[in-house]
Swiss-Prot record:
It comes from Campylobacter curvus (strain 525.92). This is Isoleucine--tRNA ligase. Disulfide bonds: none annotated. PANTHER family: ISOLEUCINE--TRNA LIGASE, MITOCHONDRIAL, SOLEUCYL-TRNA SYNTHETASE. Belongs to the class-I aminoacyl-tRNA synthetase family. IleS type 1 subfamily. Zn(2+) binds at residues 893, 896, 908, 911. Its cofactor is Zn(2+).
Amino acid sequence: MDYKDTLLLPATDFPMRGDLPKNEPIRLKSWYEERKIYEKMKSKRAGAAKNFAIHDGPPYANGHLHIGHALNKILKDIITKTHYFFGENVRYVPGWDCHGLPIEQQVEVKLGDKKKELSKTQIRELCRAHAREFIDIQREEFKALGIIGDFENPYMTMKFEFEADIYRSLCEIAKKGLLIERSKPVYWSWAAKSALAEAEVEYEDKEDYSIYVAFELDSDALAKLGVKLAKAVIWTTTPWTLPANQAISLKPDEIYVLTSENLIFAKPLLESLVNLGLTKGEILKEFVSNELENTHAINPLNDRKSRFLLGDHVLMDGGTGLVHTAPGHGEDDYYICLRYGFKEILMPVDDGGLYDETLKAHSLLRADVVDSFVGMHIFKANEKIIELLGENLLHVSKFTHSYPFCWRTHKPVIYRATKQWFIAMDEPKLGGKTLREVARGELENVKFYPSVGIKRIGSMIENRPDWCISRQRDWGVPIAFFRRKDTKEPIFEPKILEHIAKIFEQKGADAWWDMSVEELLAPDSGFEAKNLEKVMDILDVWFDSGSTWHAVLNSKNYDAGSYPADMYLEGSDQHRGWFQSSLLVSTAINSHAPYKNILTHGFTVDENGQKMSKSKGNVVAPQDVAKSYGVEILRLWVGLSDYSSDLKISENILKQVSEQYRKIRNTIRFLLANVNDLETIGTDFGFLDQWILGRAKRVFDEASKCFRAYDFSKGFNLLLNFLSADLSGIYLDICKDRLYCDAKDSPRRRSAQSAMAIITKSLLPLIAPTLTYTVDEVMDYAPAIIKGDAKDAFDLVYEPINFDFDVEDELLFASREKFFELIDALKKDKKIKSTLELVLETTSSKILDYDSVERADIYMVSDVHRYSGNEGLGEFEIDGEKFKIVLSDASKCPRCWKFNAIIDGSTCERCSEVLNSVC
């Protein structure tokens, strides 16, 4: 007789292999086109007690997605779905950042010389078309990652009503008195011909000159010191700024010395300058810095007077203690000159980084050489400036240091004083508090994941300068203010500002270029158009994205959750970017942070921790992963990774993740296949079923806590360990006998099936936020006992296992582990082929009290007896209890293979009963 036909073998159509690259796009299409899953998610949780929404940090609408985009969007999706599968009402509206230099540069490259023939509006329309093209590309690439959101109505910063709301945010800040216009040194990209914000600057290594230059003191300064000759020695790494020198800064109340070479240095730095060879260190005179205040030295390049000032920015950690001060080229320089009442700020450099006619107009270089410098790029001028210094150049060398570069052009930037618009950090306009104070205070109400995030953004807020928000480009939201022609005073009349905002809503911000002052001016404004002119700068794109909370969460244009947002989630670089710009705009307008929680993730690196680059050949593209492995593997990689630090990804790592996925899939497949004939879930469980349900409850409860705390790596590793070690490695392996060989309705079989069904029903919504494609596929094949009323994955809600069994299992499983160690040796020595050949003997009354079949199944032997004096194959001791392995003297049952049959060739008692019942 072929007993195989009498066994209750597993049966399911759920495939062993997911064939993910082929099947995911089909399922994605059904989610968006047929089943309208995002709308379903909204309606399913319409009456939920809790709401949750991540406000999407907008990616830039340029280029294809890279692995960093995938990490960010998948993590947002996992968190949103975690809240959803825990029963909360969720919203996720994706967005795009559309304005800015990169798109404008792309358009300029395509246009070439034709750009000169086009109007500003025509260029802006080409920029708009470029952004629209890549939004469509990125939209499909994001959706393919399994992201569920309102992709039918995303926010875009270039939409007309959005531009109007960005402008309204600017107007609100202006009304608060926090918007100021002034000449001030700012980061300037000469390559892009525009000012830059701090967030638009990256640091790279750059080789520069290090020079020490002598400025001879004038007669008044010499008289003050009571000497006949003295030279102040300054140190600088920017020789090209020396023509614009206006002062020399000293540290207040510090001791300075005049050496035998008639050179002046700060005394604390004298030893290091001796080592450099600038001086022998012989001191002729000591004096306090304050004695030189408001006296002068002579700039050797132009014979202009350079005034001695006292400033706390002068440090004793390098240089000479005398700081070259050019207020047009440095922020500290600017502020100290402002404090000393300087009326004129010299700026001899144009927007392209070339010396301009200011050199001649203010005699900043000698008359015999100045013409050769006008039109010369400042970085090319360094060597020539050094030559002009002659004997006043005391020392020159080159060194490499970290230097600010433009994030888009990748060219070194400069500090350049220009007239710009700023949001003031230290004006007490917010109920007597400054923006800095309010922003810093609001951070205390925000929860950070990881918690160190508050220190990073807090220190940045503490130390940041005023925010320069103006740019001298075309593609952006205009700083659409009128100013009086006669006084140049900007006009912030609410009626005028709102009239412009309404025009932007209807026609877009292009109207600022297309329409005349008369057409843009509100009727009955009280002003005449002929007396007004337009401000033609545009806004920093960080202001665009920093005001998205206002345009998205505070408007009726989007169903995106409420203000403040439950969460902002971006890479750790956004502490100085979007998190900060959003905080400043929100606190400036509402004195409130725009978010309740901030979660940051690290960057993606290769398996060696190296940054990815095409030149290194270590780039992992999400599109390639989807084609080779499937998106689900990428999603599981995110779920398993510790996002609080940099995340490693490579071909080898993806193979490891694929193996983990295979284990999860096969475990679920086994569960489905073995509960297919279960109609009702029982409540009467045997010892082993109580044990696995107790283990599952504890693990699932802990994992769900981890997921709620966004610790996905810990939660998923708990689940994987449970699935592979406890569930598959022990329980399911043990249960195969009762599942396959018991009678269909035997209490032991139904008890095991019920435990498996309970675990499966809790497991699926727990892993669904990450493995959404897979869980949705499972629901296509799951039997009714698992599905219940659910039609697909999005009908599921996580429910904790409510069977809390506390089974005393330490001795049992410690002895089981030791038993299998001996079994491995017995099999290696070919003394046995299967554990079913064996009987285990023990002195433990506790183990012998268990049901006889259960205790035998736990060790996967044919029986467990009381310890005897019979000869064994091996023995061991656990906690004082003895265990002995002996060969069974019974016969092998040809149906279940247990050695429980009385006669060779006959079936055991259990199998005989089953066969009799079905015959």
